[in-house]
């Protein structure tokens, strides 16, 4: 920390970068216990206009067009890295070497080698380093996890999850870094990494995968004439380039607990902008979650006893993780969404940096490395006709 305050910055001014910027802005207002003063210092992006607009919008002091300016700045302590994952390693290693605490967006890196190097850099730096698996901060998902971990409904038997989006369903969607990088770097890496971490968060570690398929359904895309943010449409040029990675992924997972999982992720799910959901069935119960109804979850437990009872609706509130005194209105029925999760995540990481121990820590770089190994295993299964692949 810089004296008695924490200076924060964000690398990347796209939609996820803006989510981090907004999260840091609101995080100090959560809970009764105070943090040190949080200073909103800088937004960096190679597109200066994007950086300036995001800094203005969220109240940051300045905008930069190079992440190195953040590394060199003595008034910055914490940096979120929210750019294409092919750029993560250089930026993260540079920031850690400069003494910054780093929260890196998922997926942590494009390769296991890069992720291992980032883990080593974090360990050598002695700084806090975390990975942005933001769905761990969902009160409803964390409540389901707690019910399973406590043994209330027994061990998990089957997890069925999906993350379906439609940002790539239009053939006129412009070419971007999301469509480059080879098999495993598309829908699997971009949104599947979230789903995989969520599955392990709820059911424990995955030991092997099989039956993976990584099809590409739109073979080429037009280059944009100018810069585009996130999944936004853009004016297109006459030049096209081939899509190098998958539009969707399906696979089966075996968990260390003995449970089986069926998972799918897609960026070409027509009409579904951001559909994340799962069901988990256990020895004596079940739970279900739908991100479109993020302020609730469905639950079946042994009371009343007997099959056929169906799900009962549970509205999240002060009895569930992260919520007590966490929002101006924290009672059931208020409702929470994905944007709120970035606030909870920012608060947790700031507390880690401040040396506080009141909230579950964000995912570690070691956990981020494990996620990359899982992505590799799924890609290997697909490459080998759906073979069973053990996760290293």
Locations of regions flagged by a protein language model:
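N-terminal Rossmann-like dinucleotide-binding module
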Residues: 1-58
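Predominantly a Rossmann-like dinucleotide-binding segment in NAD(P)-dependent oxidoreductases
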Residues: 16, 135-242, 385
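Short, conserved SAM-binding/catalytic segment
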Residues: 54-60, 121-125
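Conserved SAM-binding strand-loop segment of SAM-dependent methyltransferases
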Residues: 61-67
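Beta-strand-loop-alpha-helix segment that lines the small-molecule cofactor/substrate pocket
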Residues: 78, 84-85, 89-137, 151
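C-terminal capping/lid region of NAD(P)-dependent oxidoreductase domains
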Residues: 127, 154-158, 380-392
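C-terminal glycine/acidic-rich active-site capping loop/insertion
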Residues: 134, 218-246, 250, 254-255, ...
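Glycine-rich phosphate/pyrophosphate-binding beta-alpha loops
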Residues: 193, 264-273, 337
């Amino acid at each position: 920390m810089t004296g008695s305050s924490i200076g924060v910055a964000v690398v990347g001014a796209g939609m996820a970068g803006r989510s981090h910027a907004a999260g840091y802005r609101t995080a100090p207002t959560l809970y009764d216990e105070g943090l040190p003063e949080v200073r909103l210092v800088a937004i960096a992006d190679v597109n200066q206009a994007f950086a300036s607009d995001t800094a203005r919008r969220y109240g940051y002091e300045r905008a930069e067009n190079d992440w190195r300016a953040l590394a060199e700045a003595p008034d910055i302590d914490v940096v979120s890295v929210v750019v294409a994952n092919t750029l993560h390693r250089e930026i993260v290693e540079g920031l850690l070497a400069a003494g910054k605490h780093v929260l890196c967006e998922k997926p942590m890196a494009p390769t296991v080698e890069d992720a291992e190097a980032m883990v080593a850099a974090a360990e050598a730096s002695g700084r806090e380093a975390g990975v942005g698996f933001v769905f761990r901060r969902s009160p409803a998902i964390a409540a389901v996890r707690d019910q399973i971990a406590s043994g209330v409904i027994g061990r998990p038997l089957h997890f069925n999850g999906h993350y379906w989006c439609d940002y790539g369903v239009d053939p006129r969607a412009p070419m971007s870094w999301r469509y480059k990088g080879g098999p495993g770097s598309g829908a699997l890496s971009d949104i599947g990494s979230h789903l995989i971490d969520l599955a392990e968060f709820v059911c424990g570690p995955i030991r092997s995968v099989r039956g993976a398929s990584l099809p590409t359904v739109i073979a080429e895309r037009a280059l944009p004439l100018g810069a585009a943010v996130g999944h936004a449409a853009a004016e297109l040029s006459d030049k096209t380039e081939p899509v190098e990675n998958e539009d969707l992924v399906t696979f089966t997972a075996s968990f260390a607990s003995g449970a089986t999982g069926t998972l799918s992720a897609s960026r070409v799910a027509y009409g579904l902008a951001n559909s994340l959901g799962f069901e988990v069935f256990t020895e004596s119960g079940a739970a279900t979650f739908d991100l479109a109804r993020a302020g609730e979850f469905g639950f079946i437990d042994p009371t009343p006893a007997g099959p056929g009872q169906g799900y009962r609706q549970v509205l999240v509130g002060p009895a569930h993780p992260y919520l007590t005194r966490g929002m101006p209105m924290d009672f059931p029925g208020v409702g929470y969404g994905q944007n709120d999760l970035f606030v909870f995540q920012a608060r947790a990481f700031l507390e880690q940096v401040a040396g506080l121990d009141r909230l579950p820590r964000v995912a570690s770089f070691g956990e981020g490395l494990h996620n990359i190994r899982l992505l590799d295993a799924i890609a290997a299964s697909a490459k080998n006709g759906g073979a069973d692949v053990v996760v290293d």
